[in-house]
């Protein structure tokens, strides 16, 4: 059958809705303060992944690697650059990056960034998988 034939349906019975989160409200309730270098607001953990919003101040974010997890970032607010494995890329609201484990990366934002991150496997807030390299 073609992709447009509505008589054939995929079985979605195994999918369940766990939670729907208002990201803006979660971030508004957990604002970054001037005393904090950065903040992560965790939105949830699955069996294989974590979702959180990173909030930072304008300026650099040090080069680092994650030894055990891949990282997907979606820019909610902010403009700047991301340096990934030695290559610098401009980033702005709406951009996405995918960074495999053990890939050096860091950034510089011109204004306060908010980035939605998905980490797989889980990024444990109590046992951070981040090694600073500069």
Predicted regions, residues:
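Short hydrophobic/aromatic-rich beta-strand segments that constitute the beta-sheet cores
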Residues: 53, 82-84, 115-117
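Short, conserved beta-strand element in jelly-roll/cupin
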Residues: 55-56, 65-82
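Short acidic-glycine-tyrosine-enriched beta hairpin
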Residues: 86-101
């Amino acid at each position: 059958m073609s992709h447009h034939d509505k008589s054939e349906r995929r079985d979605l019975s195994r999918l369940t809705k766990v939670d729907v989160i208002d990201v803006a409200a979660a971030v508004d309730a957990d604002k970054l303060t001037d005393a904090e270098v950065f903040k992560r607001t965790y939105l949830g953990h699955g069996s294989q992944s974590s979702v959180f919003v990173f909030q930072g101040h304008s300026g650099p974010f040090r080069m680092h690697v994650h030894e055990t997890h891949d990282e997907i970032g979606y820019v909610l607010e902010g403009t700047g650059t991301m340096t990934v494995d030695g290559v610098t890329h401009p980033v702005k609201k709406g951009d996405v990056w995918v960074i495999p484990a053990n890939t050096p990366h860091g950034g510089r934002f011109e204004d306060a960034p908010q980035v939605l991150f998905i980490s797989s496997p889980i990024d444990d807030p109590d046992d951070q998988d981040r090694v600073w390299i500069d």
